Amino acid sequence: GYAMALTDHLSVGVQMNYHLVRLPEAYGRNQAVTAEVGFMAKITENWHLGFSVLNLTRNKLSSYQEDRYSSLLRLGTRYHVSNKVIFLGEVEKNVDYPIRFKSGIEYSPAENVYFRGGFGTAPIEFSFGFGYHWKGIYKLDVGSAYQQIIGWSPNLSFTVQMK
């Protein structure tokens, strides 16, 4: 992905996502690339508001009943309570499903160490994870989410921030 500040209070970002889905033999596998674009506004020093759109092209997941990767519209907010605690909230609309509400908290007990927890509705989802950032460039984030329909989903990301 790539992001840039348009002004002191407004930023824009774009991101490409690679998806690989492998299911049992009868279903096979599929791969696709989706795009995301987002805007973030700095309302105050501690409060940010963002909006993003994911997969507007409605890429196909399979030919079965026109299955497609999700297309999402998201409006979110982030509030820094202190330099150690951040509250987050989001309203998400998948074009095929009802609106979801999500909330989360991030706690940093030490520099570059982060613990996270979250909750979502429709369907109910709980998530947790931790992150470690080093040298101001590298980020490793590990987590898991439990959703009432599909069960546990592990998450892993490694990010290199280029300036």
Predicted regions and their residues:
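Outer-membrane beta-barrel porins/channels
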Residues: 1-163
